[in-house]
């Protein structure tokens, strides 16, 4: 089940986020990637701002995503799934949920992921996102930026 996050979910969201991003950090041999430095206060702030959705398996938080609207653009961020729950369509469902929530308010969705993150790129491209540009961040990390125009009913 996917729905809005509540402040009481912050600790679980942060735990899932850290678990999910450890594999990303390993891909880039960098334990200091930004999502691993997020704090409980950062997660709470996103929740209070109405940006966060969670996926639950019973009472357990198994995934989360943020949708940050600025003008006519929604930036999709921190899409995470608990490592033991991957491959079950949770990431796709979270992405679809944030898009459905914001589709009437925005002209496009944007997001980025690391260039070595093949699973993430497959998910985003499969959901209709197209590459727009690549930004080199370090010698081992480039960010692939993607965007999508909402489907209007």
For each predicted feature, which ranges?
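A short beta-loop-alpha structural element at the N-terminal edge
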Residues: 1-15
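Conserved GNAT-fold acetyl-CoA-binding loop/helix
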Residues: 15-43
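A short helix-loop-beta-strand connector motif used in the catalytic cores of GNAT acetyltransferases and
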Residues: 40-54, 75
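Conserved beta-strand in the GNAT
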Residues: 54, 60-68, 73-80
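Glycine-rich acyl-CoA binding loop
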Residues: 76-77, 87-95
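A short, internal acetyl-CoA/4′-phosphopantetheine-binding micro-motif in the GNAT/acyltransferase core
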Residues: 79-86, 113-115
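Conserved active-site alpha-helix within GNAT-family acetyltransferase domains
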Residues: 92-96, 115-133, 138-139
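Conserved GNAT acetyl-CoA-binding A-motif
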Residues: 102-113
């Amino acid at each position: 089940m996917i729905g809005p996050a509540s402040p009481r979910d912050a600790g679980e969201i942060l735990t899932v986020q850290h678990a999910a991003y450890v594999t990303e950090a390993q891909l880039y041999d960098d334990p200091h990637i930004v999502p691993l430095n997020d704090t409980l206060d950062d997660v709470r702030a996103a929740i209070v701002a109405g940006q966060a959705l969670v996926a639950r398996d019973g009472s357990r938080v198994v995934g989360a995503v943020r949708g940050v609207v600025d003008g006519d653009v929604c930036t999709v961020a921190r899409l995470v799934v608990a490592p033991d729950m991957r491959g079950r369509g949770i990431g796709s469902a979270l992405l679809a949920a944030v898009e459905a929530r914001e589709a009437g308010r925005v002209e496009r969705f944007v997001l980025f992921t690391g260039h070595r993150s093949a699973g993430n790129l497959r998910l985003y491209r499969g959901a209709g996102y197209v590459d727009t540009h690549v930004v080199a961040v370090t010698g081992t990390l480039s960010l692939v930026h993607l965007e999508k125009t909402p489907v209007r009913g």
